[in-house]
Swiss-Prot record:
Keyword Coiled coil: no
Membrane-spanning residues: 618-640, 656-679, 684-709, 729-751, 777-802, 824-845, 851-872
Origin species: Mus musculus
Entries under CDD domains matching the protein: 7tmB2_GPR64 (cd15444)
Protein name as catalogued: Adhesion G-protein coupled receptor G2
Amino acid sequence: MLFSGGQYSPVGRPEEVLLIYKIFLVIICFHVILVTSLKENGNSSLLSPSAESSLVSLIPYSNGTPDAASEVLSTLNKTEKSKITIVKTFNASGVKSQRNICNLSSLCNDSVFFRGEIVFQHDEDHNVTQNQDTANGTFAGVLSLSELKRSELNKTLQTLSETYFIVCATAEAQSTVNCTFTVKLNETMNVCAMMVTFQTVQIRPMEQCCCSPRTPCPSSPEELEKLQCELQDPIVCLADQPHGPPLSSSSKPVVPQATIISHVASDFSLAEPLDHALMTPSTPSLTQESNLPSPQPTIPLASSPATDLPVQSVVVSSLPQTDLSHTLSPVQSSIPSPTTPAPSVPTELVTISTPPGETVVNTSTVSDLEAQVSQMEKALSLGSLEPNLAGEMVNRVSKLLHSPPALLAPLAQRLLKVVDAIGLQLNFSSTTISLTSPSLALAVIRVNASNFNTTTFAAQDPTNLQVSLETPPPENSIGAITLPSSLMNNLPANDVELASRIQFNFFETPALFQDPSLENLTLISYVISSSVTNMTIKNLTRNVTVALKHINPSPDDLTVKCVFWDLGRNGGKGGWSSDGCSVKDKRMNETICTCSHLTSFGILLDLSRTSLPPSQMMALTFITYIGCGLSSIFLSVTLVTYIAFEKIRRDYPSKILIQLCAALLLLNLIFLLDSWIALYNTRGFCIAVAVFLHYFLLVSFTWMGLEAFHMYLALVKVFNTYIRKYILKFCIVGWGIPAVVVSIVLTISPDNYGIGSYGKFPNGTPDDFCWINSNVVFYITVVGYFCVIFLLNVSMFIVVLVQLCRIKKKKQLGAQRKTSIQDLRSIAGLTFLLGITWGFAFFAWGPVNVTFMYLFAIFNTLQGFFIFIFYCAAKENVRKQWRRYLCCGKLRLAENSDWSKTATNGLKKQTVNQGVSSSSNSLQSSCNSTNSTTLLVNSDCSVHASGNGNASTERNGVSFSVQNGDVCLHDLTGKQHMFSDKEDSCNGKSRIALRRTSKRGSLHFIEQM
């Protein structure tokens, strides 16, 4: 018609040419639409219903082939039935979209990845070939599968992708094959067509994403295994144009998490069971069962053998497995077999690898981790947990432990509770069960609380985590915990029945134990924990022993701390605490701890201070032992002198000095014996030595404080204080209070004392010492106790200095030089008598710590020697006693020579001496026949107005003394009063009480005592 129309019309008319052109365009458009429709019909025909065949895999076009992502492979045997189960479906995390074209190069910088997981579950009528391995009693194979089908699967994945990762495991008890695969699509693949194919057959990938522009793409199966998609806008293809360009969604669509079970016929399987445990994700929230329409494939691979594309490496390994995980590391569990009590079914891992590339960064988000943790919590809330599901959860937690710490921190406490709940709700029939994964190991033991024996849990080989319940633990353990047999002795009666199982956990990575409050401390070990049926176990009579290897070797000169994870710290977020734990032994690669409770344990390295080098430690050790030895000798001489010569120990200060010297002597002797006793490593003996060392240290501190208290009475109270049985009460306080403190510590737990290592000598020998093991006990009963005494003594020391300054103002100019020397001697004597040198310990840190440690070691270990110098050798009355009874010849002093001289010249030379003597730091009286060690009035025959040896040192005060029955009273105006007393007033029990009634120095006798 068109042609004939042309006969009757002028050929060159423009209207006709335009009409012809339009008609031609319409025809071309119809042809394009027709071709597109035919292609869509072809794809639909592939998915037409059929009861005799099933979909098991997808075949995309290879590079350079037209779009065939919707074509399906394999016509399957009609007689064999199987179930294809999509165990888990994750929310699709897609890629940035382009609106013009749909190939991968426009969407991603490299490739798109799809991850899927399927379970082949055979029906009862399916013949399963089982090969019994008589050597080890395990099943060497579950399914007898042909190499042809394996080749078909390999070819399918190779055609679909540049590289892929697949791992399958067999479970004998369930007669299933579980496979997880990850495919890296070719760059020329049509993404939308691939998505349409997945949606049509109702199978979604577990994950769907592309490489992040900031990170390189995986290029090997190992990297594909660790791939986690970065959350981006998902791919959204137009509904009416499934092959058209994808659209970018502003928000991620919510894809329901479901388990889709499809009953189809299949004769496809793997040639061999695969040696890798696959982790089946947690219990799904929705289960859907449907019959898939069977497609009519255009390329039936089952009809002819297919040749595998060349691959570069195949990794095959075998290990007894039944747990499911899509990680490369082996996972162990125990699932009973129908024919054997606890079979261990070997599996085989097949890895098709390509040239290795760069590592992919974990790109999960908090919402992803939150969803996975919530799923596990929901499954645990249902009650009893079967071993296979427990193994899956352990593997899931193990995988989450490698998430970025910043993302994992908000969920750390919940994950710890999930791990505890797994062991608490685990249902098993045997006595013990253990579940291991690459980063987490869990073991549960059934126990009888009334008959509990010592139990040990150990973990081995961090690269292939294994557990052991042998006692003692294996030598190659990276972490072990030993529970004493007395663990449950103190449980309440209603808790004994509940204590039916003990759970052990081992964390290969400390991701769940991040403490932001740590400043100069860092975790250097693995983490191990133990619990008894989710009960609180503390204040044990015998401590738990924990041995942990260091992740990296630590130098011997660094300080470590044994700590446990306290859930209540940092506002409920958890944190490390050392309460109840102490270091028992430290080596370069391992630390052994003892703790009085059960929880999660670890080792912290103290970076705040660096310990001294071994050579410095050796020098300080020698100084300490030499100083203690010298002090012991001279303290003994001081004690013998004051005990042997009755005339120099009649006053109260001398008696107080005797008690202090006795305490210091016993302290030094026990300290010298301590290291030698520690070599025998006898627990009871070592505890006894530590107890006595603690006791005599507190006694020494207490008597130093009593010296200061006596000075307070002499200076402040003066005449107005009288204390009956003065020394007896001092003895009760000085020896009794330390005994009460030590008794309380022993009552709480004898294990607060024990052997500990305090460094090493240059030859590597450990410096073991019997001392306090608990930091809490040490800081309260030693540091706190000493701080109180030290503050009292420093205050008293300042008061004495003030008094010396007042006295010096009243001195005549000619005598100042002499009194200045006496003042210095008095100050030095008080410094050692009151233990002021112990204050060097407060400065033994920072850049000057070495200097002050040497000062501390020298002055404190020689405290006994300095007491001998200032309170024996420097005292004139003591030297006279030595000359009278110990010397001979010209050095010997006549027994009554000093008494006659004093009687003749005493009245002529009496002057008020307001200086402080070098031996007693007190005012000297000219009536000093024996020159005793009173603190402020230095007179052997001094009458103490209050019965305590007190005398006034004020401007109008009065000092007095007794000489051979005569009492000499001196006021500061130089007047002298004499009276007779028939009783010996030099015995410290004067019957005269005096009271100052005016500032002029007048005295009144108020009563006789």
